[in-house]
Amino acid sequence: MRYEYKVSESWIGTLGILARRLAVVALLCGFCLDASAGNQKEEAMADSVRLALSKAITDSRPPNLQFSDIKDRINYLYWRGEMSERLKSKLPDLQVRQEFLHTVWYEAKRAGLDPQMVLGLIQVESGFHKYAVSPVGARGYMQVMPFWTRTIGDGDPQKLFDMQTNLRYGCSVLRMYIDMEAGDLYLALGRYNGSRGQAEYPNAVRAAWKKWDYKE
């Protein structure tokens, strides 16, 4: 099975090109859906890719949304309103919900990802629990493994409980995996979960993604 996903050439400078050329040593382990991305393993990566990822992660600019015209902004506001209604049971506080959706949109678009897919992945990974921790230590909304803070961040895994930081790591890492897999989302999701080539996790994300489907 193969899910095709378009590669964003504009993502964080040259990272997309670098990642597709990356020579990796993949350390894969057995699959367990309950642990979600907690099965993800650290991989060897080229210094240039590590540097580009680190630059993306440490960019401290606030998530200010940019729209090409008023129509795009109106479409975003409609999207946020509908997603907010769907999220009420998971995130009851309106301000928290709106800030979360604002950040999901920003980080997904920044990494060239579909915000609906990111919402589906978060549903599978953490059930929208900000402080979720897997049995092996993956943290936050997107269940980011702490080793990423050492590899491309400042080494502080506690920051993975910060909403924007967690979404930044999760979206950046998934974007890298998509590029590494030449746009094959099925394999990229498997790599994110540590179960490359197995169907259960990618299929779970795809099913959740459909539940967040949105038509403009």
Where are these regions (language model features)?
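N-terminal secretory targeting signals
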Residues: M1-E85, K90-L94, K210-E216
